[in-house]
Regions:
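Gly/Thr-rich phosphate-binding beta-strand-loop-beta motif of the actin/hexokinase/Hsp70
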Residues: 67-88
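Short beta-strand-loop/turn "lid" adjacent to the catalytic site in phosphate-handling enzymes
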Residues: 1-4, 22-54, 81-82, 87-90
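Glycine-rich phosphate-binding loop plus the immediately following alpha-helix
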Residues: 4, 88-129, 225
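Phosphate/pyrophosphate-binding loops at sites that engage ATP/ADP/AMP, CoA/4′-phosphopantetheine
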Residues: 16-31, 170-181
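Adenine-nucleotide phosphate-binding core of ATP-dependent small-molecule kinases
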Residues: 141-174, 216
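Conserved phosphate-binding/catalytic loops in two-lobed NTP-binding clefts
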Residues: 52-53, 199-221
Length: 252
């Protein structure tokens, strides 16, 4: 993974070269490359591109075949997706345009409190009395954070309150796709244990979560699954296929 900024093509080439080096492979060993994410059209060496919604759904169903509903919470969007019994997308909903329904909301809240994104999980973990953040706009949330601080609320309680707010929005989005178990949670924001715990508490039923930092790679892994299938279908007889996928992660 690499921070891309606006240099999406450069970032995609960088992570692709690094992946080849780590795998001990050459470019010619890769039969098919799929670009996904917001920068998918900027991946210069791709064979084709797919939406991150499709890729994340495929990644979720690959790891957890019983998945029927996927919640994908990333830095830019929140997506709820219903799948059929073979992992195809039946319906989906995205959050409203405002960043309050995305990881950017938590990043901005942390910044207002004087913390980095990497500190969010540890900060929220020591909260004792979460302070609700009622604002529906990540930009206007700054004034609400300042107000809570002036009233004596701790940064930890404000941070956890922001997570509670984000979880409430995610559950509402899931209801709009007529959610049903099994649920699978993906996206970079699912790195924060307190958010995962709250979502599991709200949903009930079977909730699947990839371990460690893997939730943020679900779309890339799903693209790899699609790439392998397409690479195998197009391979010449007798050729050994080592296929992969390219995914661009845009850091906000």
């Amino acid at each position: 993974m690499a921070r891309s900024g606006f240099r999406l093509a450069e970032a995609s080439q960088k992570v692709f070269d690094a992946a080849l080096l780590e795998a001990g492979a050459r470019r010619d060993d890769v039969a098919y490359v799929i670009g996904t994410g917001y920068g998918r059209f900027q991946v210069p060496f791709r064979d084709v591109q797919v939406t991150d919604l499709t890729a994340a759904a495929r990644g979720a169903s690959f790891f957890f075949p019983g998945t029927r509903t996927v919640l994908d919470v990333g830095g830019q969007t929140m997506k709820a997706t219903r799948l059929d019994d073979v992992g195809r997308v039946k319906s989906f909903r995205l959050n409203d345009k405002c960043a309050a329904g995305t990881g950017a909301f938590l990043e901005k809240t942390a910044r207002y409190l004087g913390y980095a994104t990497e500190d969010i999980g540890a900060l929220a973990a020591v909260s004792h009395d979460p302070v609700p953040i009622s604002g529906v706009c990540a930009v206007f949330a700054e004034s609400e954070v300042i107000n809570h601080l002036s009233l004596g609320a701790s940064p930890a309680d404000i941070m956890q309150g922001s997570i509670v707010s984000l979880v409430a929005r995610s559950v509402q989005l899931l209801k709009r796709v007529q959610m049903e178990p099994e649920f699978t949670l993906v996206g970079g924001i699912l790195r924060f244990p307190s958010m995962v715990s709250l979502i599991i508490e709200k949903l009930g039923g079977t909730v699947n979560v990839l371990h460690d930092d893997m939730p943020q790679y679900a779309a890339a892994l799903g693209a790899a699954v699609l790439a392998r299938r397409r690479g195998l279908s197009q391979a010449a007889p007798g050729r050994e296929v080592r296929s992969g996928a390219a995914a661009v992660t845009v850091s906000v």
